[in-house]
Amino acid sequence: MENITFGFQGGRKSRLNDPPDSYAKDFFYTYHLFKSNFNNVNIIEFKNSNSSIKKSLFSFLRYLTTIPFYCEQVLNKKNKDIIKKTNNLICVNQRVSFSLMPYTIYRSLTGKINVSVFIMGLFLDQKRHFIRTILRHFFIYIFCFSNKNLIFLSKEELNFAKKKYSKFKHKFHFLPFSIDTDFWKSNKSFDKKDKIIFVGNDEKRDFEFLKNLPKNLPNLEFVLVSKFLTENDFKETNNTKVINGVWSDKILTDVELKNLYDTALMSLIPLKDSYQPSGQSVALQSMAMKVPVLITDTKGFWQKDCFSDSENIFFMEENTTKYWIERINYFIENKNILRNVSINAEKLVLENYNLEIFFNNLKKIISN
């Protein structure tokens, strides 16, 4: 296997200039391991376009099709030259793949390049105007036809896609997201952890529900990290710290986030119900840091058969303030339950969701 290129939206190249132990490798999708094991491993990233015409054109196309075509941000000469020399292209999400598709589709169909894409939420049904629905299904069909491997981060979405697009199920693979367990590790005593943490920016998080929790738990200290939350959302409370930003902007370094996890007694992940495996990375990071996770039990949870309620995670049945308050208070009063879950959670992640396992499985998928 040679000439491998990873397609990212952004935020990776700049991190490669940082000291290796200063950032987690989670969102590189094992780029570092491929780089150390194979020759000619490259990265392409999105870059804002200066062309207002292109911006308007692809903005209209996105509106019309509901497909994430951001071609103006990635189809530049530099990236095209890299792709010309690429045999295996790994797109870390469908936005990257769709945005490259006008250039890669011919090379894919002629066997000059094998494109593998990580899927998250692409196949979910939503109510749309019938014209947009037709166009969306058309482009998804072309997407499935032209790409070699479609890699799902959630078993549930994989099963859903197999029913909806059964013709392409031979291209479908399941590979759960994994994290840098060498980075996400805690040396802090469980007894010294006392904060409640929330981390997350995807739109399947239930932010409106979350806003009501701190004021109803005034004796607990909350740390909330999200671009969708501000201090103004919690003006009525004095127990909430909000860090507004996203991973790619480096508002918070990975080391700083790790230190926040190290103060946390619990990690909250309230979700809206969907097939999307929302909260996956935060849950695994928390668990590796020995922070028990409270997560809404949704149909999109990525691998139910590996997790057990109250053994290595806490599945929350509903997003009501009363229910979550009762559960949180119960755990505060019974910290031995939290302690046991934190131990089991760390063990589960170390054994099943480390980057070495992810690398070996991804290598098998793209080699076939």
Where are the predicted features?
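Nucleotide-activated donor-binding/catalytic signature segment of Leloir-type glycosyltransferases, i.e.
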Residues: 226, 231-261, 266
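Acidic anion/phosphate-binding donor-loop and adjacent secondary structure
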Residues: 162-163, 173-193, 208, 234, ...
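A short, active-site helix/loop in glycosyltransferases that binds the activated sugar's phosphate group
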Residues: 146-170, 181
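Membrane-proximal helix-turn-helix segments that form the acceptor-binding/catalytic region
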Residues: 77-85, 130-150
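Conserved donor-binding/catalytic core segment of Leloir-type glycosyltransferases
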Residues: 188-205, 210-217, 223
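A short, well-ordered alpha-helix in the C-terminal region of glycosyltransferases
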Residues: 323, 330, 337-352, 358-364
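Conserved acidic donor-binding segment of nucleotide-sugar-dependent glycosyltransferases
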Residues: 201, 307-309, 313-321, 330-336
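Acidic donor-binding loop of glycosyltransferase active sites
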Residues: 259-276, 291
